[in-house]
């Protein structure tokens, strides 16, 4: 269905995954972080400002949109979160900005063959 390195979470796996996410988000919220659930893909020009350009073809999934728009699936919620303030000038008194992002992340993990170590399996969506 999803090909190599795709998976389903089922039953208690779903419950455990959601419990861990909820615990983490609750912890961050109590520490004063603003919770953010960003979009799963962003425009190419924004992605170019938030990641290393070498990541584009090697690690990121491209999404074909309108004729004039290219989008990329996010590899981390930090990419769209950092872009939220891309045209702002921040005053020192307004810092630090503290965000807790929750999202699925998407990476090709190209060349990841043989890199599964210590029980961690590289997958395309996590």
In which residue ranges do the predicted regions lie?
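TRNA-recognition modules of translation machinery and tRNA-sensing kinases, especially anticodon-binding
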Residues: 1-126
């Amino acid at each position: 269905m999803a090909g190599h390195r795709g998976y389903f979470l089922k039953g208690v796996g779903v419950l455990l995954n959601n419990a861990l996410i909820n615990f983490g988000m609750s912890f961050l919220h109590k520490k004063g972080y603003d919770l953010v659930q960003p979009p799963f893909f962003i425009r190419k020009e924004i992605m170019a400002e938030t990641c290393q350009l070498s990541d584009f073809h090697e690690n990121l999934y491209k999404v074909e949109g309108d004729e004039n728009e290219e989008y990329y699936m996010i590899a981390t919620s930090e990419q769209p979160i950092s872009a939220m303030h891309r045209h702002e000038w921040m005053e020192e008194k307004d810092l630090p900005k503290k965000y807790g992002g929750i999202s699925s992340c998407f990476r090709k993990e190209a060349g990841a063959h043989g890199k599964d170590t210590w029980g961690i399996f590289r997958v395309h969506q996590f």
